[in-house]
Amino acid sequence: CKKWEKLGYRPDAVVLEGPLAGGHLGFRIDDVELESNKLENLFPSVKDMAMKYGDIPVIVAGGIYTHEDIVHYQNMGAAGVQMGTRFLATEESSASESFKQAVVAAKDEDIVVAHRPGSPCGLPFRVIKQSPMYVSSLKQLRKPKCDKGYVLQRDADGKYTVCGAKESNENFFCICNGLLSSGGYNTDKEEALYTVGTNASHVDRILSVKELMQELSGT
């Protein structure tokens, strides 16, 4: 906030994502399950800081699943919630049909935090362990090829040329192509990578967005 304040800008909102989210997690692998990092424990200090800068709205994310969850965080002072997995499993979602069905089939033990091998970004990465690309990565069946370049790191000259998967394939695997495939792109060329939040195991059917919104609003 201080940086943007100096430039004359004020954030429209801040999104606080807890460790139950899908995909990349902003925590060290050893800190993902700490009690202190639970969303409800992180929220108060973030809300207090947002208040100091003019009551910037705080939106919470990661593990929000029910109407009761939404009400709980609204009562704590959240301006809103951000939800991914629940809307992924809707009729209108652009996710591939195989992705949606993988979510419906997923059990608690099927949802894991990938780390070694993991994302070339170096962050813990929550995924369905049966994801075709993840299975291949564990067996190092897919040779890394960085033809998208979305998560390249800087080299000694400050240019984005370093691919973690190419540099250390035993520790990292390509994710860009797999994520695109899970969204229905290049499915004939690339295996899919299914990222979900921990509560994906509760999804038992594909809903319409209208049905989901009625459920989430408590109507």
Where are these regions (language model features)?
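Active-site-proximal beta-alpha core segment in soluble small-molecule metabolic enzymes
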Residues: 1-9
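Conserved active-site-proximal phosphate/metal-binding subdomains
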Residues: 2, 19-59, 65-219
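Residue-level recognition of the N-termini of beta-strands and the immediately preceding loop/turn
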Residues: 11-12, 56
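Non-cysteine beta-strand/loop elements that form the S-adenosyl-L-methionine
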Residues: 12-20
